[in-house]
Amino acid sequence: MVVTRDEIMRIYRTHVDAELAHDSARAASTYCPDGTYRHMPTGLVFKGCEAVRLQYAMSYVSFPDQGFDIAREVLDGDTLVHWGTLTGTAKGAFLGLPPTGRPIALPFVAAIEFRDGAMAGETLWYDMLTLCEQAGYPFEAVQQASSEARRRLGA
């Protein structure tokens, strides 16, 4: 099924609105049933709408005041890339590490692929060392926790 530019932008705006509202179910509903969320800083891959929903829900626990400002977005074919700044406060556990209460303002880039009237996948990049420095997480502990999470998820 060919997805038009207008349809892609409608799906994308619905998704962004859901993320900003911390509505993990609505954010995940914009994905194809076999959609994938790739979190490159940790190496974690979430496959299927339920796993994607849980990923969003976990991020809202880790950073309950999480938000983002999109500086720019570019759509080419069936792929949209946007970049900006992720903001929030480390008020909840992150990868099992205790909250620090420290704020973050983290530059990010995300690429979103579309297929059959939905998001086929999203890939998120940011610098983990920058997150650790801002939030006060020990980098080595985050690396170890990421490795353990990948092992548990079979990624």
Question: Which residues does each PLM region occupy?
Answer:
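C-terminal and inter-domain tail/linker signature
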Residues: 1-155
